[in-house]
Amino acid sequence: MGYILLKLLIIYIFIFSFLQADKPILVKNNCASVITVGVLTNGISSSFPELSFDLTPSASNSFSKPDSWGGRVWARYHCSGSAGKDAQNCGVPGAVNPASLAEFFFKGTGGKDFYDISLVDGYNMPLSISPSGGSKPDGYECGSPICSLSSCPPEYAVTDATGSVVSCMSACSKTGSPQDCCTGNYNTPETCKQNAQAADVKQRCPDAYSFAYDDQKSTYSCEANGYTITFC
């Protein structure tokens, strides 16, 4: 009897470990310059990413996260080495220093992963997300969102000390108004509508979130084994 119980325990541990296995995320740099990749888990308040690494052109690197992880991944130019200590230009993306985001929420409703490209705060470079090991792609089911948007209207441009454009604000990041940010009296899908800037971004980058309530045309789901994020 003891032998049988031991075998059952081993099987249980194996199955539990398999179900809780970490999920790999591969990041590729298709840009012409070095990029610095940042990773931050949802719920962590920090000025800097919890994980950061540089990628030279054509290089790639991978990291793994628990099967229940939720967080975001981004990349920036000119943030390697000591430059990365500049929180304003190289820290966690926000209204004043936006970046194109790859967002993930593993093991959500129905056991599926949910992922998207978010330009809600703004953007700074093209990117795409591709699942691996899931079912055959069908629209938002195991699809591969892509956004090649890179140009920025002058009125939304964020520039560095030399005047070079480093990222592009959204209308919400620029004005902070409840109407543009879907807050206050505009915090529901019924009251918050796409502003002109968000509509322009959505037209040029239809796979991505352009404002807070863009869920129906921006959220992808899949039971995947891992993901690849490609910048540029």
What is each model feature region?
Residues 2-232:
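Extracellular low-complexity, O-glycosylation-prone Ser/Thr/Pro/Gly-rich "stalks"
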